[in-house]
Protein backbone atom coordinates (compact mmCIF):
# COMPACT_ATOMS: atom_id res chain seq x y z
CA UNK A 1 0.00 0.00 0.00
CA UNK A 2 1.47 3.31 -1.09
CA UNK A 3 -1.45 5.77 -0.89
CA UNK A 4 -3.37 5.98 2.39
CA UNK A 5 -6.06 8.41 3.57
CA UNK A 6 -6.45 9.26 7.26
CA UNK A 7 -9.84 10.55 8.43
CA UNK A 8 -10.44 12.11 11.85
CA UNK A 9 -12.57 14.62 13.75
CA UNK A 10 -10.86 17.98 13.81
CA UNK A 11 -12.81 18.83 16.98
CA UNK A 12 -10.86 16.19 18.91
CA UNK A 13 -7.26 17.23 19.67
CA UNK A 14 -6.15 13.65 20.42
CA UNK A 15 -7.40 12.54 16.99
CA UNK A 16 -5.55 15.38 15.26
CA UNK A 17 -2.32 14.53 17.10
CA UNK A 18 -2.63 10.84 16.29
CA UNK A 19 -3.33 11.65 12.63
CA UNK A 20 -0.12 13.65 12.37
CA UNK A 21 1.84 10.93 14.16
CA UNK A 22 0.50 8.28 11.79
CA UNK A 23 1.24 10.51 8.82
CA UNK A 24 4.88 10.88 9.93
CA UNK A 25 5.17 7.16 10.69
CA UNK A 26 3.82 6.21 7.26
CA UNK A 27 5.99 8.79 5.48
CA UNK A 28 9.10 7.09 6.90
CA UNK A 29 7.87 3.95 5.13
CA UNK A 30 7.48 5.74 1.80
CA UNK A 31 3.70 5.93 2.01
CA UNK A 32 1.90 9.00 0.66
CA UNK A 33 -0.72 10.15 3.16
CA UNK A 34 -3.85 12.21 2.55
CA UNK A 35 -5.46 13.64 5.71
CA UNK A 36 -9.15 14.56 5.82
CA UNK A 37 -10.01 16.59 8.88
CA UNK A 38 -13.20 18.41 7.95
CA UNK A 39 -15.56 16.38 10.11
CA UNK A 40 -18.03 18.01 12.46
CA UNK A 41 -18.44 17.17 16.13
CA UNK A 42 -21.02 14.49 15.32
CA UNK A 43 -18.65 12.70 13.00
CA UNK A 44 -20.68 13.56 9.90
CA UNK A 45 -18.92 13.99 6.57
CA UNK A 46 -21.80 15.77 4.87
CA UNK A 47 -19.60 18.43 3.26
CA UNK A 48 -17.48 15.90 1.35
CA UNK A 49 -18.04 14.13 -1.94
CA UNK A 50 -16.62 10.80 -3.04
CA UNK A 51 -14.05 12.56 -5.23
CA UNK A 52 -12.35 13.89 -2.10
CA UNK A 53 -10.50 10.59 -1.84
CA UNK A 54 -7.78 10.41 -4.50
CA UNK A 55 -8.46 7.79 -7.13
CA UNK A 56 -5.35 5.81 -6.18
CA UNK A 57 -6.25 5.53 -2.48
CA UNK A 58 -5.29 2.04 -1.26
CA UNK A 59 -6.63 2.31 2.28
CA UNK A 60 -8.64 4.61 4.55
CA UNK A 61 -7.66 4.78 8.23
CA UNK A 62 -10.49 6.12 10.40
CA UNK A 63 -9.61 7.66 13.77
CA UNK A 64 -12.67 7.84 16.00
CA UNK A 65 -15.63 5.74 17.02
CA UNK A 66 -18.12 3.66 15.11
CA UNK A 67 -20.08 6.77 14.13
CA UNK A 68 -17.10 8.23 12.31
CA UNK A 69 -16.55 4.97 10.46
CA UNK A 70 -20.23 4.88 9.47
CA UNK A 71 -19.83 8.34 7.94
CA UNK A 72 -16.76 7.22 6.02
CA UNK A 73 -18.63 4.15 4.76
CA UNK A 74 -21.31 6.44 3.37
CA UNK A 75 -18.68 8.72 1.86
CA UNK A 76 -16.97 5.86 0.04
CA UNK A 77 -20.30 4.69 -1.43
CA UNK A 78 -19.59 2.18 -4.21
CA UNK A 79 -15.79 2.56 -4.30
CA UNK A 80 -13.91 -0.56 -3.26
CA UNK A 81 -11.44 1.15 -0.92
CA UNK A 82 -10.70 -0.97 2.18
CA UNK A 83 -11.18 0.67 5.59
CA UNK A 84 -9.59 0.15 9.00
CA UNK A 85 -10.72 1.87 12.20
CA UNK A 86 -8.70 3.00 15.23
CA UNK A 87 -11.04 3.29 18.20
CA UNK A 88 -11.09 6.66 19.94
CA UNK A 89 -14.76 6.44 20.84
CA UNK A 90 -16.89 4.21 23.03
CA UNK A 91 -18.03 0.68 22.16
CA UNK A 92 -15.96 0.34 19.01
CA UNK A 93 -17.46 -2.76 17.39
CA UNK A 94 -16.33 -1.51 13.97
CA UNK A 95 -13.10 0.18 15.01
CA UNK A 96 -11.26 -2.88 16.27
CA UNK A 97 -7.76 -1.37 16.59
CA UNK A 98 -6.79 0.52 19.74
CA UNK A 99 -4.30 3.36 20.12
CA UNK A 100 -2.01 1.02 22.05
CA UNK A 101 -1.64 -1.49 19.21
CA UNK A 102 -2.16 0.93 16.32
CA UNK A 103 1.36 0.89 14.89
CA UNK A 104 1.79 -2.85 15.33
CA UNK A 105 -1.40 -3.43 13.35
CA UNK A 106 -0.42 -0.92 10.65
CA UNK A 107 2.91 -2.72 10.31
CA UNK A 108 1.01 -5.94 9.71
CA UNK A 109 -1.18 -4.29 7.10
CA UNK A 110 1.76 -2.78 5.21
CA UNK A 111 3.34 -6.23 5.23
CA UNK A 112 0.23 -7.80 3.74
CA UNK A 113 -0.70 -9.72 6.90
CA UNK A 114 -4.44 -9.08 6.83
CA UNK A 115 -7.69 -10.18 5.25
CA UNK A 116 -10.58 -8.17 3.87
CA UNK A 117 -14.04 -8.77 5.29
CA UNK A 118 -16.94 -7.80 3.08
CA UNK A 119 -19.69 -6.33 5.24
CA UNK A 120 -23.06 -6.21 3.53
CA UNK A 121 -24.93 -2.93 3.37
CA UNK A 122 -28.57 -2.09 2.81
CA UNK A 123 -29.98 0.10 0.07
CA UNK A 124 -32.88 2.17 1.35
CA UNK A 125 -35.25 3.91 -1.07
CA UNK A 126 -38.27 6.10 -0.44
CA UNK A 127 -40.77 6.51 -3.28
CA UNK A 128 -43.39 9.24 -3.20
CA UNK A 129 -45.98 9.52 -5.95
CA UNK A 130 -43.88 7.43 -8.36
CA UNK A 131 -40.74 9.49 -7.65
CA UNK A 132 -37.65 8.43 -5.75
CA UNK A 133 -37.14 11.13 -3.12
CA UNK A 134 -34.53 9.47 -0.90
CA UNK A 135 -31.81 6.87 -1.44
CA UNK A 136 -29.00 5.80 0.89
CA UNK A 137 -26.74 2.88 1.62
CA UNK A 138 -26.46 1.91 5.27
CA UNK A 139 -23.89 -0.23 7.06
CA UNK A 140 -25.67 -0.61 10.41
CA UNK A 141 -29.38 0.00 10.17
CA UNK A 142 -32.38 1.87 8.85
CA UNK A 143 -34.99 2.82 11.45
CA UNK A 144 -38.60 3.89 10.99
CA UNK A 145 -40.03 5.41 14.14
CA UNK A 146 -42.58 7.87 15.40
CA UNK A 147 -42.07 11.33 16.82
CA UNK A 148 -42.09 12.03 20.54
CA UNK A 149 -45.78 12.98 20.60
CA UNK A 150 -47.05 10.68 17.85
CA UNK A 151 -49.33 7.75 18.59
CA UNK A 152 -48.62 4.12 17.71
CA UNK A 153 -47.72 3.69 14.05
CA UNK A 154 -48.90 0.88 11.79
CA UNK A 155 -46.27 -0.38 9.34
CA UNK A 156 -47.54 -2.70 6.61
CA UNK A 157 -44.67 -5.06 5.82
CA UNK A 158 -44.36 -7.02 2.56
CA UNK A 159 -41.53 -9.49 1.78
CA UNK A 160 -40.89 -10.39 -1.87
CA UNK A 161 -44.40 -9.30 -2.75
CA UNK A 162 -46.03 -11.37 0.01
CA UNK A 163 -47.75 -9.75 2.95
CA UNK A 164 -45.99 -10.44 6.26
CA UNK A 165 -47.88 -8.46 8.89
CA UNK A 166 -48.93 -5.11 10.30
CA UNK A 167 -46.30 -4.02 12.79
CA UNK A 168 -47.96 -1.76 15.36
CA UNK A 169 -45.76 -0.01 17.88
CA UNK A 170 -43.06 2.65 18.04
CA UNK A 171 -41.36 1.53 14.84
CA UNK A 172 -39.08 -0.99 13.12
CA UNK A 173 -35.33 -1.53 12.84
CA UNK A 174 -33.90 -3.00 9.64
CA UNK A 175 -30.40 -4.15 10.46
CA UNK A 176 -27.41 -5.71 8.77
CA UNK A 177 -25.36 -8.34 10.61
CA UNK A 178 -22.77 -5.60 11.24
CA UNK A 179 -25.48 -3.46 12.82
CA UNK A 180 -26.91 -6.30 14.88
CA UNK A 181 -24.87 -5.16 17.91
CA UNK A 182 -26.19 -1.58 17.66
CA UNK A 183 -29.81 -0.39 18.05
CA UNK A 184 -31.05 -3.86 17.07
CA UNK A 185 -29.39 -5.39 20.14
CA UNK A 186 -30.74 -2.69 22.46
CA UNK A 187 -34.26 -3.39 21.15
CA UNK A 188 -33.98 -7.11 21.89
CA UNK A 189 -32.79 -8.28 18.48
CA UNK A 190 -30.30 -11.11 17.87
CA UNK A 191 -26.55 -10.86 17.46
CA UNK A 192 -25.61 -12.07 13.96
CA UNK A 193 -22.04 -12.85 12.89
CA UNK A 194 -20.86 -9.71 11.03
CA UNK A 195 -19.91 -11.38 7.74
CA UNK A 196 -23.23 -13.23 7.40
CA UNK A 197 -25.63 -12.29 4.61
CA UNK A 198 -28.94 -11.45 6.25
CA UNK A 199 -31.44 -8.69 6.99
CA UNK A 200 -32.91 -8.44 10.48
CA UNK A 201 -36.29 -6.85 11.21
CA UNK A 202 -36.73 -5.93 14.87
CA UNK A 203 -39.89 -4.26 16.25
CA UNK A 204 -39.54 -1.30 18.60
CA UNK A 205 -41.93 -1.55 21.56
CA UNK A 206 -44.42 -3.68 19.62
CA UNK A 207 -48.09 -3.40 20.62
CA UNK A 208 -48.44 -7.10 19.74
CA UNK A 209 -46.45 -9.06 22.31
CA UNK A 210 -45.93 -12.03 19.97
CA UNK A 211 -44.09 -9.87 17.40
CA UNK A 212 -40.45 -10.89 17.55
CA UNK A 213 -37.33 -10.12 15.49
CA UNK A 214 -37.03 -12.07 12.23
CA UNK A 215 -33.87 -12.84 10.25
CA UNK A 216 -34.34 -12.92 6.47
CA UNK A 217 -31.93 -14.01 3.73
CA UNK A 218 -30.18 -11.07 2.11
CA UNK A 219 -31.85 -11.53 -1.30
CA UNK A 220 -35.34 -10.51 -0.14
CA UNK A 221 -37.04 -7.25 -1.14
CA UNK A 222 -38.74 -5.56 1.80
CA UNK A 223 -41.50 -3.03 1.22
CA UNK A 224 -42.97 -0.89 3.97
CA UNK A 225 -46.01 1.39 3.88
CA UNK A 226 -47.87 3.32 6.54
CA UNK A 227 -51.09 1.49 7.34
CA UNK A 228 -52.71 4.65 8.70
CA UNK A 229 -52.00 8.28 7.82
CA UNK A 230 -49.97 9.81 10.63
CA UNK A 231 -47.55 12.70 10.95
CA UNK A 232 -44.07 12.76 12.49
CA UNK A 233 -42.86 9.39 11.20
CA UNK A 234 -39.14 9.44 10.40
CA UNK A 235 -36.74 7.20 8.49
CA UNK A 236 -33.17 7.37 9.82
CA UNK A 237 -30.13 5.72 8.20
CA UNK A 238 -27.18 4.75 10.40
CA UNK A 239 -28.39 7.29 12.94
CA UNK A 240 -27.03 10.15 10.83
CA UNK A 241 -29.22 10.96 7.82
CA UNK A 242 -32.90 10.56 7.17
CA UNK A 243 -36.19 12.00 5.99
CA UNK A 244 -39.69 12.72 7.24
CA UNK A 245 -42.16 10.25 5.75
CA UNK A 246 -45.46 11.21 4.14
CA UNK A 247 -48.55 8.98 4.56
CA UNK A 248 -48.37 7.71 0.97
CA UNK A 249 -44.63 6.93 0.93
CA UNK A 250 -43.32 3.47 0.09
CA UNK A 251 -40.01 2.38 1.61
CA UNK A 252 -38.04 -0.34 -0.20
CA UNK A 253 -35.10 -2.05 1.50
CA UNK A 254 -32.73 -4.48 -0.22
CA UNK A 255 -29.14 -5.63 0.10
CA UNK A 256 -26.82 -3.08 -1.54
CA UNK A 257 -24.71 -4.19 -4.48
CA UNK A 258 -21.42 -3.00 -2.98
CA UNK A 259 -20.35 -4.21 0.48
CA UNK A 260 -17.95 -2.28 2.67
CA UNK A 261 -14.45 -3.75 2.58
CA UNK A 262 -13.24 -3.80 6.19
CA UNK A 263 -9.66 -4.81 6.95
CA UNK A 264 -9.15 -7.46 9.64
CA UNK A 265 -5.75 -8.39 11.02
CA UNK A 266 -4.99 -11.78 12.66
CA UNK A 267 -5.18 -10.27 16.16
CA UNK A 268 -8.81 -9.16 15.73
CA UNK A 269 -11.21 -11.79 17.09
CA UNK A 270 -14.96 -11.13 16.76
CA UNK A 271 -15.78 -13.33 19.75
CA UNK A 272 -13.21 -11.54 21.89
CA UNK A 273 -14.76 -8.22 20.86
CA UNK A 274 -18.19 -9.47 21.96
CA UNK A 275 -16.84 -10.72 25.28
CA UNK A 276 -15.03 -7.48 26.02
CA UNK A 277 -17.62 -5.00 24.78
CA UNK A 278 -20.63 -6.80 26.26
CA UNK A 279 -18.73 -7.95 29.36
CA UNK A 280 -19.68 -11.59 28.96
CA UNK A 281 -18.43 -13.85 31.74
CA UNK A 282 -17.62 -10.94 34.02
CA UNK A 283 -19.03 -10.83 37.53
Swiss-Prot record:
Role summary: Involved in the regulation of the intracellular balance of NAD and NADP, and is a key enzyme in the biosynthesis of NADP. Catalyzes specifically the phosphorylation on 2'-hydroxyl of the adenosine moiety of NAD to yield NADP.
Species of provenance: Syntrophobacter fumaroxidans (strain DSM 10017 / MPOB)
Main location group: cytoplasm
Keyword Chloroplast: no
Gene: nadK
InterPro entries: ATP-NAD_kinase_N, ATP-NAD_kinase_PpnK-typ_C, NAD/diacylglycerol_kinase_sf, NADK
Cofactor: a divalent metal cation
Gene Ontology CC terms: cytoplasm
Entry EC number(s): 2.7.1.23
Keyword terms: ATP-binding, Cytoplasm, Kinase, NAD, NADP, Nucleotide-binding, Transferase
Signal sequence range: none
GO term, biological process aspect, one: NAD metabolic process
Active site residues according to the UniProt entry: 66
Protein name (record): NAD kinase
Organismal lineage: Bacteria, Pseudomonadati, Thermodesulfobacteriota, Syntrophobacteria, Syntrophobacterales
Residues noted as binding NAD(+) in the record, renumbered to the chain: 66-67, 140-141, 151, 168, 170, 240
Major enzyme class: transferase
Subcellular location: Cytoplasm
Record flagged with keyword NAD: yes
SUPFAM superfamilies: NAD kinase/diacylglycerol kinase-like
Family, as annotated: Belongs to the NAD kinase family.
Record's catalysed reaction(s): NAD(+) + ATP = ADP + NADP(+) + H(+)
Superkingdom per UniProt: Bacteria
UniProt GO molecular function: ATP binding; metal ion binding; NAD binding; NAD+ kinase activity
Gene3D superfamilies: Probable inorganic polyphosphate/atp-NAD kinase, domain 1, Probable inorganic polyphosphate/atp-NAD kinase, domain 2
Pfam family, one: NAD_kinase_C
